[in-house]
Amino acid sequence: PQCTGFALFFDDISGEGTNPVKQTELLNRLTKDFVKSKGDVAYLTVCPTDYSKLWANPTPQGSLAIYGETLDPSIEVFWTGDVVCSDLTPETLDWVNSRIKRPAYFWWNYPVTDYVRNIILQGPVYGLNTSLDSNDLCGIASNPMEHGEASKLALYGVADYTWNIAAYNPIDNWERGLGELMPKAREAYRTFAIHSCDTETGYRRDESWETKTFRIGDWNETEAQALWAEFDKVEKAPAEIEKGCTNKGLMSELTPWLQEFGKLGTRGKRSLELARVYRDGKDDADFWNKYIRNLMSKKDREDYEAHKSGTMKLQPFYENAMDDMAYGFLTRLSGETPICYRGIGSFHNAKTTLSKLMFDHDTTTYYTSGIAQKAGDWIGV
């Protein structure tokens, strides 16, 4: 039986080690003199220097084409897709397989968060094409977070996908996974998980898809009541999870995020209560006192930035609501329109509250698009 396997990684290096000819010579020698001579060793796996289409040389002189021409057919080749963190698609596999002349071994950089360590990904596993088979890829490796227990929700999805690719359903799998990981506090865990999915930058994920938020100027009482109920669930979820979670390792990993999640629920509820006072417009002093009470202090923001959730809808609702009410209140008091700076641009996250970091008077914070600029991109104020 093949009980041992080895992999060589030529990713993220420079110098002579990037030479694909020397790489294949080494790999072929190891295959001949070690793997095949031993007999009980699994096929080698290699991560090429050109592991992503983002920078891979597409020509016949590129390393992938050299792999295809000279690398022992038994050796499996890692591939991350069109970019470092990307979906598994027939198109990206066609591109790489035609060069390496074998089905690629897909290295899926999810749920890894080494580029956003202040986020813990608990959303559904999607972005994996369900029409693929062994002619398209030889396997899939999921790169987990540094949080082993919290990674299990995503790994449950990847395992389910590999078990039956054609029948895989991301939402059905996610719903089952929540119950498997936290059966005694499933609903509270679901409340946290559905609002802890997106990365804000890089490999974007859908989040809070069951929650409708709005601007204060578009107030609708029915929607406001529904949003208050959701923030109430958010506020209560940490205590319910702590009470029902029997996995101490998972609880330990989630706790810093749950603490901030509960605070997010509290300030969301207060924002809606404050909005009613604001809309009533009868007691300016009461409004302003409650407004000041609901502002996040510097410490509050530091704590939230360190362990973020609700980044796509919940926290933006709070930020926008507080800004809209302050703007409207000052306009009402002074009779003049205040000057308000806002970030604009072609980047998707320029439209989010991340752009406020341009104007927070803190030299240690900044806005970043999170992606490389290309022709036609712009950012402005």
Please state what every model-predicted region is.
Residues F6-I13:
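Short, conserved phosphate-binding/catalytic loop or strand-edge motifs used
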Residues I13-E175:
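Catalytic-core regions of glycoside hydrolase
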Residues L153-N164, T266-K269, D377-V381:
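Short, Φ-rich (hydrophobic/aromatic) sequence segments
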Residues A167-P338:
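C-terminal functional modules
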Residues T331-V381:
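Disordered, acidic Ser/Thr/Pro-rich linker "stalks" and the adjacent N-terminal cap
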